[in-house]
Amino acid sequence: MSDSEYLTRAEAVLAAIERSLDDADADIEFERSGNVLTLEFENGTKIIVNLQPPMQEIWIAAKSGGYHFRFVDGEWRDTRNGTEFYAALSEYATQQAGEPVEIAP
């Protein structure tokens, strides 16, 4: 994948997260600064989603740990266990929000 293809796909992920959070019932604040999207929950915990262009990855830093995702066969997948990006982010957000959170493309 070229660098421009990576950026187009990765930027679309950040935009999709923002749209999902705008529509979510959960009270999750978010702020974007360049390639970094910070989600802040009512309890003060945060999830950081950031783009890593040199590696063509998207990284998530959550209370449960750090996760790296790479675009494989049309989806962003965890480089360790193959979990799909939106499913993983929804799970981490649900854990930190203490209520169901669904983040979808």
Curated annotation (Swiss-Prot):
GO terms for biological process: iron-sulfur cluster assembly. Gene3D superfamilies: Frataxin/CyaY. InterPro entries: CyaY, Frataxin/CyaY, Frataxin/CyaY_sf, Frataxin_CS. Belongs to the frataxin family. The keyword Signal does not apply. One of its GO terms (molecular function) is ferrous iron binding. Transmembrane segments: none annotated. HAMAP family: CyaY. It holds the Pfam family Frataxin_Cyay. It comes from the Bacteria. GO terms for cellular component: cytosol. Keywords: Iron, Metal-binding. Involved in iron-sulfur (Fe-S) cluster assembly. May act as a regulator of Fe-S biogenesis. This is Iron-sulfur cluster assembly protein CyaY. SUPFAM superfamilies: Frataxin/Nqo15-like.
